[in-house]
């Protein structure tokens, strides 16, 4: 495809019918296509996340990123909104599920939608991607180094989160997981634990682990960026969504 696309800020119906700001990117043309909900990382609804959203449009998908911190600090700069959300303990799981469900419904209501929607999240969004796929009708999920899908947050961790072990039997979509072997949250041992739990419940999943990569290896604007891991990860994501979403 040509890669031509358009992007805009929209409003969607989120949890409990709340109006939520979101960033929508769409490829040009009327071809039938799947959709991708992008869950932003802990630093928030920032330029890097919007670039990722546009990248999915360039790949041929309708893509949307809801601003999960919209209620905490409407109109605030990403860093300020993220700080406010952290001070509030992070995004409650129930609210996250409702906002992602609203984003998925928005994508399915667009002209040209083939009805298939995937979700992807980075950092805290990786855990939230798995959470969403355990509670919402989705067709594919990608977890990029999401912490505390298994395991327990350390003392002093700013977000009020618990692991998803009790929810994993409800995982309703194939899962692609991308992890760095130098990460601590999730650690390689935690990735292995997650792999074993999913296998025990016969959940379709595909994990890839990268040496010389830790947390946030996709983040091009951070010292944690690792070119080889990120490039391979994007190839895995592209192939996975092509299979599961019909792209």
Regions inferred by a protein language model and the residue ranges of each:
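N-terminal cap/leader regions of alpha/beta-hydrolase-fold enzymes
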Residues: 1-247
């Amino acid at each position: 495809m040509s890669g031509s696309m358009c992007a805009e800020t929209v409003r969607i119906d989120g949890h409990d019918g709340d109006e939520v700001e979101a960033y929508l990117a769409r490829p040009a043309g009327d071809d039938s296509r799947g959709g991708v909900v992008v869950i932003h990382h802990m630093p928030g609804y920032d330029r890097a996340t919007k670039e990722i959203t546009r990248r999915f449009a360039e790949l041929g998908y309708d893509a949307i990123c809801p601003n999960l911190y919209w209620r905490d600090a409407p109109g605030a700069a990403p860093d300020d909104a993220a700080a406010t959300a952290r001070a509030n303990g992070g995004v409650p799981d129930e609210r996250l599920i409702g906002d992602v469900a609203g984003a998925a419904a928005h994508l399915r209501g667009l002209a040209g939608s083939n009805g298939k929607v995937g979700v992807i999240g980075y950092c805290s969004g990786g855990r939230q991607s798995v959470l969403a796929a355990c509670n919402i009708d989705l067709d594919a999920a990608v977890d990029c180094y999401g912490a505390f899908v298994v395991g327990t947050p350390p003392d002093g961790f700013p977000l009020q989160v618990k692991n998803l072990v009790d929810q994993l039997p409800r995982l309703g979509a194939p899962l692609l997981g991308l992890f760095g072997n130098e990460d601590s949250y999730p650690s390689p041992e935690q990735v292995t634990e997650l792999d074993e739990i999913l296998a025990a419940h016969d959940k379709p999943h595909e994990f890839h682990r990268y040496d010389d990569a830790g947390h946030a290896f996709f983040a091009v604007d951070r010292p944690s960026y690792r070119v080889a891991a990120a490039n391979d990860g994007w190839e895995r994501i592209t192939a996975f969504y092509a299979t599961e979403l019909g792209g």
